[in-house]
Amino acid sequence: ACSGGVVGRVQLKVNTGLSRNGAPEAQWAEFFALAKSLQDQGSIIVTGLWSHFACADEPDHPANEQQELVFRTAISHAEAIGLEPEFKHIANSAATLWRPSAHFDLVRCGISIYGLSPNPQIASSRDLGLTPAMTVKATVVNAMDLPKGAGVSYGHTFVTEHPTRVALVPMGYAEG
């Protein structure tokens, strides 16, 4: 942004427990201080602070309470050094539906935007008033017969319980 002559608008991600990117708590002081310094220099504007739930599709999972607490702590740390992000957000589809305390300034619906329930065992798409937004179609590019006990795909996430015919469609993770 600086070399291009523009002020970068950034949102800072903190790790609250998903452990998939974001500044870990041990680095917050340095992370927020650097962001504040760059903002004071006019290089960036910190527009948001965010994180992501690991277990929101299981509303009673204890990690949800812990992650929300850690996120609130991160907000306090950022504000204590003078950062005032306009948007603070952690809620995915499941937290949007089942954890109103985590709505903060905005929510980030993902799977529910497509009309799917984040956890059909709790509530179906229909129960939630969601309508599927698309239909996915693909061509079968290979089919094979497998014996009982054959592992399929990375990590053998599916193991045949009896002789089974499987088909490959060229889409998604590892074309499975």
Where are these regions (language model features)?
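Functionally critical, mid-to-C-terminal surface segments that flank or help form catalytic/ligand
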Residues: 133-176
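Active-site loop/helix belt of alpha/beta enzymes
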Residues: 2-9, 16-147
